[in-house]
Structure formats: C-alpha cells, structure tokens
Amino acid sequence: MATLVLSSMPCHWLLFLLLLFSGEPVPAMTSSDLPLNFQGSPCSQIWQHPRFAAKKRSSMVKFHCYTNHSGALTWFRKRGSQQPQELVSEEGRIVQTQNGSVYTLTIQNIQYEDNGIYFCKQKCDSANHNVTDSCGTELLVLGFSTLDQLKRRNTLKDGIILIQTLLIILFIIVPIFLLLDKDDGKAGMEEDHTYEGLNIDQTATYEDIVTLRTGEVKWSVGEHPGQE
C-alpha cells in the first residue's frame, strides 16, 4: 500500500502543475449571467417544434409551442435583419389555436413573403418577465419564381444549349472533316508519285528495240512437233 501512495504522488504534482500553468482561473457563473428565460421564472419552460421547416409554395405549415404557464402567448415573425413583428390572424390563412398548454400556429397557402423565423412570446403574471422562446422555427418557402426569374432561367438555358451545340460542332464534326481531307491528300500524293524516279534519258528508243528473230523450224509442215 505504501508503494501505491508513493507512486501516486508524482501524478498529483503533475496535475497541480497543469492546473497552475493552464491559464487564469475563470469565475463561476452566477444567476445574473443566465438568460432571462433560464432563471427559473414561471415562463422559463417554453418549447417550440419544429426548429426548421421547408415547404413548397401554396402548401400548409404548422408550428407548435408548449408551455407550463397559463399566461397569454403571442406569435412573432422575424424577417432577415428586421425587427420581430407580431403576427395577426388572417381568416382562412393564418390561424392561432390553443389546446391546453399547446399553442399552434397554422399558415395556409404559404408564399415567399412568409419566409422568416417564427417564435412565441409569453407574458407571465409578473410584470417584469416577458420571455421569448430563444430557438424559434425557421420557415423556408420553396418553388417560388417571379416572371423575371423565369425569363432569366430560360435565357440561361438557351445559352447553355447554344454553347453545347458549338462544342459538338467543334469537337466532333471538325475532326471528321480533317480526317477526310487527310485521306484525300494521301490518295492524291500516291497518284502524283506514280512515275516518280523515271528518267527519260535512260529509256530505250524504238531503234534500240531488238527485233524478234525466230529460229528455224525443225519440223515440216503438217508434222506435229511431238511426233518423231
């Protein structure tokens, strides 16, 4: 047992040195450093679902907010760098409902203008506590295109088709014509070199051609050469 105590001493010293030279000590976090909705107030328990939603244009989306407090709850929407705006119910499109501790926001026939971050805010009994859900839900509307965007896309498609056609002509048709021209050139060169190397001075004239002299016939007329 003594050996175990002695062997553990260097480890303790090493740990102490690491803690000493690792950096300045960080003070403990106090309750004042926590966000307002995490300080244990009655409004601290707020959950929102889902965290992200991507929907097609003209479809429907629902956001749910759960709370353990009975105070009034309001929905807000934040677009980009703008300030959050309170949502106002629209008959047949934006509907806010409550079922016990569950608050539901329903948006029908969503459009591109509905993009943004949605979150709920609850007013507690205490006058100094207004808690906003820190996470919220981001809505992304898909499939929205204006007339100008469609025109630009069609122009881009036409340009891509034209470029592809030019590339096909450049890399397929042009090499074929080059190969055909090369074959025609080879055939012409072979025809041109038919009499190449023939020297006219070395050719024989008609006077140099030896006349054919036939020898005397050994057989008589009417006698077959194969007969003795």
From Swiss-Prot:
Membrane topology: Single-pass type I membrane protein
GO biological process: adaptive immune response; B cell receptor signaling pathway; response to bacterium
Record's comment on post-translational modification: Phosphorylated on tyrosine upon B-cell activation by SRC-type Tyr-kinases such as BLK, LYN and SYK.
Alphabetized GO MF terms: identical protein binding; transmembrane signaling receptor activity
Entry's transmembrane regions: 159-180
Organs and tissues of expression: B-cells.
Disulfide bonds: C43-C124, C65-C120
Sequence ranges on the Cytoplasmic membrane side: 181-228
Cellular localization per UniProt: Cell membrane
Residues covered by the ITAM domain: 184-212
Keywords: Adaptive immunity, Cell membrane, Disulfide bond, Glycoprotein, Immunity, Immunoglobulin domain, Membrane, Phosphoprotein, Receptor, Signal, Transmembrane, Transmembrane helix
Residue numbers on the Extracellular membrane side: 26-158
Region forming the signal peptide: 1-25
Domain called Ig-like V-type: residue spans: 41-132
In-chain residues carrying the UniProt-annotated modification Phosphotyrosine: Y195, Y206
Principal location listed in the UniProt entry: membrane
Residues annotated as glycosylated: N68, N99, N130
Domain of life: Eukaryota
One GO term describing the cellular component: plasma membrane
Domain-related comment: The transmembrane helices of CD79A and CD79B chains and two IgM heavy chains assembly in a four-helix bundle structure that appears to be conserved among different BCR isotypes.
The protein's assembly and partners: Heterodimer of alpha and beta chains; disulfide-linked. Part of the B-cell antigen receptor complex where the alpha/beta chain heterodimer is non-covalently associated with an antigen-specific membrane-bound surface immunoglobulin of two heavy chains and two light chains. Interacts with LYN.
Function: Required in cooperation with CD79A for initiation of the signal transduction cascade activated by the B-cell antigen receptor complex (BCR) which leads to internalization of the complex, trafficking to late endosomes and antigen presentation. Enhances phosphorylation of CD79A, possibly by recruiting kinases which phosphorylate CD79A or by recruiting proteins which bind to CD79A and protect it from dephosphorylation.
Name of the protein: B-cell antigen receptor complex-associated protein beta chain
Organism: Mus musculus (Mouse)
Lineage: Eukaryota, Metazoa, Chordata, Craniata, Vertebrata
